[in-house]
Design a protein with these regions (language model features):
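Small beta-barrel nucleic-acid-binding modules, primarily SNase/OB-fold domains
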Residues: 1-172
C-alpha cells in the first residue's frame, strides 16, 4: 500500500459490517472509555453491495461477507489515519493470521505484534483494489468488460439455449 500519514492504534470490537470496506465498531480509548465510530478502510475500495447493478452487487456482497468473516474472531486492531471527507475514521484493520484461513502473501502488511492487514487481504483475494480517494474507474471498467463478455456469450448461443438457461436461473 502507499505511504501513510501519522497514525494512532486502538483495539476495536465489531458492531456491524456495512460493506466490504466500511464497518461500525467500538474503539477502546483506554481507561474504560469506548466510542462507537464508522471506519472506512484506508487505501482500498470494494464493489458496492447496495446498488441496482446485479453484477456489482454480487461482488459487493461477497466482499462484505469476507470482511465479516475476517472480523468475527473478536477484538481487532485499528490503525487510524484521521477522518476522511465524509466524516468517517480512515483506518487499516489488523486481525490474527488465524482469521484468514489460508497462507498469507508476503505483500500483506503486518503489525508489530504479528497481526495481518484486512485491507491487504481483501486486495489479494480480489475483493478490493487500491484506492486513493479519486474516481472509482477500475471497478466500473471491470464490470463493463464482464457485461460485454456475457452479451457475447448470449449472441454465440442459439435462442432456445439462452431461453432454457434463463428459465433455469429463474426457476431453479
Amino acid at each position: 500500500m502507499a505511504k501513510k500519514p501519522a497514525s494512532f492504534e486502538y483495539n476495536g470490537t465489531l458492531v456491524k459490517v456495512l460493506d466490504g470496506d466500511t464497518i461500525d465498531c467500538y474503539i477502546d480509548l483506554g481507561f474504560d472509555l469506548k466510542i462507537k465510530k464508522r471506519i472506512r478502510y484506508m487505501g482500498i475500495d470494494t464493489w458496492e453491495s447496495r446498488t441496482r447493478d446485479l453484477d456489482e452487487k454480487k461482488k459487493g456482497l461477497a466482499a462484505k461477507a469476507r470482511n465479516k468473516e475476517l472480523l468475527e474472531a473478536g477484538v481487532f486492531k485499528i490503525v487510524s489515519y484521521g477522518t476522511g471527507k465524509f466524516g468517517r475514521v480512515l483506518g487499516e484493520i489488523f486481525v490474527s493470521p488465524d482469521a484468514v484461513g489460508h497462507e498469507i502473501a508476503e505483500n500483506v502488511d503486518r503489525s508489530s505484534d504479528g497481526l495481518v492487514s484486512i485491507n491487504d487481504i481483501l486486495i489479494n483475494e480480489g475483493h478490493a483494489y487500491e484506492y486513493d480517494g479519486g474516481k472509482k474507474k477500475a471497478f466500473v471498467a471491470e464490470i463493463a468488460t464482464e457485461k460485454a463478455a456475457k452479451k457475447e456469450d448470449l449472441v454465440d448461443k442459439p435462442a432456445e439455449e439462452n431461453q432454457e438457461e434463463e428459465w433455469q436461473k429463474n426457476n431453479g
